[in-house]
């Protein structure tokens, strides 16, 4: 019986943490990620190279610390190049759509 209550408490605790962390992630995206601009998403993100053209051009032309490609879920061509002004951490985006 004690195991069941501990498990229930653990699940509840993890759920609460997940709910409270979500707004921070969204706030980070709004503050740090800005769209490159223009209709460059597919041409900057489609070539399978590292670093992507998105990352290279965000650094060179916009003064950002990096660039990230965000693909739309239902549309393979719908992609945006977002310049990251907060973090230089590279992403695994080049391997995510192979």
From Swiss-Prot:
Q: Which UniProt keywords apply?
A: Antimicrobial, Disulfide bond, Fungicide, Plant defense, Secreted, Signal
Q: Which residues form the signal peptide?
A: 1-27
Q: GO terms for molecular function, please?
A: sodium channel inhibitor activity
Segments passing through the bilayer: none
Keyword check for Translocase, yes or no. no
State the Pfam families in the record. Answer: Toxin_3
What is the annotated localization of this protein?
Secreted
GO cellular component assignments: extracellular region
Q: Which residues does this entry assign to the site Reactive bond?
A: 48-49
GO terms in the biological process aspect are: defense response to fungus; killing of cells of another organism
Superkingdom of source: Eukaryota
* Disulfide bridge positions per record: 32-86, 45-69, 54-81, 58-83
Where mainly located? Answer: secreted
Disulfide bond found in the keyword field: yes
Cited InterPro entries: Scorpion_toxin-like, Scorpion_toxin-like_sf, Scorpion_toxinL/defensin
Q: What family does the entry list?
A: Belongs to the DEFL family. Protease inhibitor I18 (RTI/MTI-2) subfamily.
Name of protein: Defensin-like protein 192
Gene responsible for this protein: ATTI7
């Amino acid at each position: 019986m004690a195991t069941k209550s501990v498990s229930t408490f653990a699940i509840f605790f993890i759920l609460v943490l997940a709910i409270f962390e979500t707004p921070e992630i969204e706030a980070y995206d709004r503050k740090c990620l800005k769209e490159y601009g223009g209709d460059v998403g597919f041409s900057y993100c489609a070539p399978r190279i590292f670093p992507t053209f998105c990352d290279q051009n965000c650094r060179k032309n916009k003064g950002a610390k990096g660039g990230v490609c965000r693909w739309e879920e239902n549309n393979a061509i719908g992609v945006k190049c977002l310049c990251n002004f907060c973090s230089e951490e590279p992403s695994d985006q080049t391997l995510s759509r192979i």
